[in-house]
């Protein structure tokens, strides 16, 4: 009789034990959450190392830009949640439908009212680059709803991961009320434990009955989401290259026509304070930027992207 213990199938017990860890590892790597994590790592790393993201982490963000970021987030989540509602019974998405716990549109409306007042809808619109992402979300929801998983996971899991950190950065940098006005977006009232909910959500996602080909398409879609967001940065770069020319062409009274230019901290620091014509005051440039609707929308979408990237950073 052989010294090796055999199973009823005639398979060596030691062989079974040796292959068990391999099977477990293979199963884990086939999980959609793992595929997404690994499949988007490169895009994520590129995005989180941009100067804009680093500055935001340091609290280098102005209130006007944060207001515009809230605007871009409003349009993004309005599109996403509209398509999620449309597909709440679709078998490839239904297990991930948690409107009470996750939906952000109503919270964003409160933030919009805080920043812009009751007539906020008359004051805002979506930028060109952000609109492309919104259009993609609508296309996916209406034609390939299984790919909504990529957008929902990327947004909501990131928000749960980095939301509280982002909220504190914004409140400190912008001196927003500690009671939550202006940062309702980051408050998940119906999620008691973010870490546990994320684990639950990933388990639901991994249990979806999807082919490997569909999982790969979902990973590809998540990378597209990063790509759309990076296009917003490209849009910002183009706007920056046009900034000096547009400011000179349009003109703007120094300090919006108020006060003496000699009291400007930038001007006061110049060695030759006797000539006004040669001073290029950054405050004047900043005012010009904030008065240009096209640049406002671009900056809004860019700051919105940072929120998403920072959220991924803390996942």
Curated annotation (Swiss-Prot):
Q: Which PROSITE patterns match?
A: HEME_OXYGENASE
Activity control, as annotated, is: Inhibited by metalloporphyrins such as Sn- and Zn-protoporphyrins.
List, alphabetically, the SUPFAM superfamilies matched.
Heme oxygenase-like
The site feature described as Important for catalytic activity is recorded at 159
Report the EC code(s) recorded for this entry. Answer: 1.14.14.18
Give all N-acetylserine modified positions: 2
Q: Where is the composition biased (Polar residues)?
A: 1-15
Residues recorded as bearing Phosphoserine in the entry: 2
What are the start and end residues of every segment in region (Disordered)? 1-29
- On the tree of life, the source organism's domain of life is Eukaryota
Q: Give its localization.
A: Microsome membrane; Endoplasmic reticulum membrane
Alphabetical list of CDD domains matching this protein: HemeO
What membrane topology was assigned to this protein in its record? Answer: Single-pass type IV membrane protein
Residue stretches spanning the membrane: 295-315
A Gene Ontology cellular component where this protein is annotated is: plasma membrane
Molecular function terms from GO: heme binding; heme oxygenase (decyclizing) activity; metal ion binding
- Using the record's annotations, give every residue carrying the modification S-nitrosocysteine: 264, 281
- Where do the annotations place heme b binding? 44, 153, 198, 202
- Reactions the enzyme catalyzes: heme b + 3 reduced [NADPH--hemoprotein reductase] + 3 O2 = biliverdin IXalpha + CO + Fe(2+) + 3 oxidized [NADPH--hemoprotein reductase] + 3 H2O + H(+)
Could you state what the record's PTM comment says about this protein? Answer: A soluble form arises by proteolytic removal of the membrane anchor.
What this protein is called in its record is Heme oxygenase 2
